[in-house]
Amino acid sequence: NYEILFLQGGASLQFSMVPLNLMSPKNKADYISTGSWSKKAIKEAKRVGTVNVAATTEEGEGENKFFKRIPKQGELKLDPDAAYVHFTSNNTIYGTQWMSEPEVGNVPLVCDASSDILHKPIDVSKYALIYAGAQKNIGPSGVVLVIIRKDMLERSLDSLHTMLNYKIQVENNSMYNTPNTF
């Protein structure tokens, strides 16, 4: 039911690839802001479509902004018509971590699991897409693991640039271009 990809660009490129591939056809998505990585993902997603920040736990003013907690389920202002809900499972910079996935109803759930992949069990069946930068728990920096539910591949538009298209990456076994060799 899932495809596994090893791609280039690390988790940071996924901040763009996720909305480019999954925002269609609704052109809007929910993001939960809990740290530096989710803020970067939000910034990139806004280049593609409408982003609803379903919750943020950012506190402070100016350069003294920080995150010290994960939002409670009741704080989430989710849009039932969103293309997906994105969250970062473990925010290492601020030391906050989700103990369980947010409840999102029937909206596909997307997770940046860079700090949690291979660290704890993850029930993949709860997700439409999981991505994880390799440098924390898997391998060399610049590589990213993407686990994508097969039905989500149909959202990738044919007009999307080849290297950014999950469907093309699956069709080419993650090797549309030459992968790193050592």
What are these regions (language model features)?
Residues 45, 57-117:
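Active-site phosphate-binding strand-loop segment of PLP-dependent enzymes
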Residues 134-182:
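Active-site C-terminal subdomain of aminotransferase-like
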Residues 20-26, 48, 124-128, 151:
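A glycine- and small-aliphatic-rich helix-loop capping segment at beta-alpha/alpha-beta transitions
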Residues 110, 124-135, 144:
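Conserved active-site segment immediately N-terminal to the catalytic lysine
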Residues 2-27, 38-41:
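Conserved beta-loop-alpha segment that forms the PLP phosphate-binding cup at the N-terminus of a helix
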Residues 68-72, 95-101, 119-125, 141-144, ...:
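A short secondary-structure junction signal
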Residues 36-37, 56-61, 89-94, 114-117, ...:
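Short acidic/polar capping segments at secondary-structure boundaries
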Residues 7-8, 32, 54-55, 86-89, ...:
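Short beta-strand segments
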